[in-house]
Amino acid sequence: MLIKSSISSYNSIALLLLCPLIIAGCGDKLTPKPFVFDMTRLNQDGSVNDGKDYAKQPWDCVRDNQSNLIWEVKKSEPGLQNINNTYSWYDPDQNTNGGWAGKANAGVCTGSDCDTESYIKAINAKKLCGLNDWYLPSRFELNTIVDTSVSFPGPALPKAYFPESLPGKYWTDTTFKTRRGGAWIWSFDSGSDLVVEKSEAHSIRLTHVAARKPDPLKDPDVKAEQK
């Protein structure tokens, strides 16, 4: 499973989560205010798409200008990125799988084998938005696109940027610390996270950032998974 990111990106994400989601202006009075997403739409070749109507001028990815993460945009048409595809959590690399690899090819999908590792390889081979190092987001990263202003049943995403989305459960790369057979997912019907078995079949939304993802064991500024 490919894993990349950057300390600067994580610092941006920390500010993104701790300040705007809760209050309007850190240090000001605690006034509830909906979070405003700032994203740029991208075409398959990575160029900027200046359209806002997905039906007339569809885009393939979005760049979050606050976290510096790029996200894939799911599609309703059949194929590799179809919104209904599901995948089991699978990572055979003992250095990154949290102690248990999960289960290979246990989802229902088209375009690749139906597990997280296979999907990542297929998207990177496609060079989605001109990129070939997409990876499964961490629990922390996936939280940055949860739209807390959207009520159940969701989907709790900024629809202006993710127009074709389902309110399902989406995998993260984060193994549950005390149960290696489990991994964290974000549920986009309720906008909450929970732990499920790696053998289950759920959705995927890959992300990308230019630099290396920090290792909690080696980088002192990054805390290890909290649960």
Predicted regions and their residues:
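Bacterial N-terminal signal peptides that target proteins for export
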Residues: L2-A14
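Glycine-aromatic-enriched surface loops/turns that form tight recognition elements
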Residues: L21-Y135, R139-K227
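Bacterial N-terminal signal peptides
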Residues: I13-I22
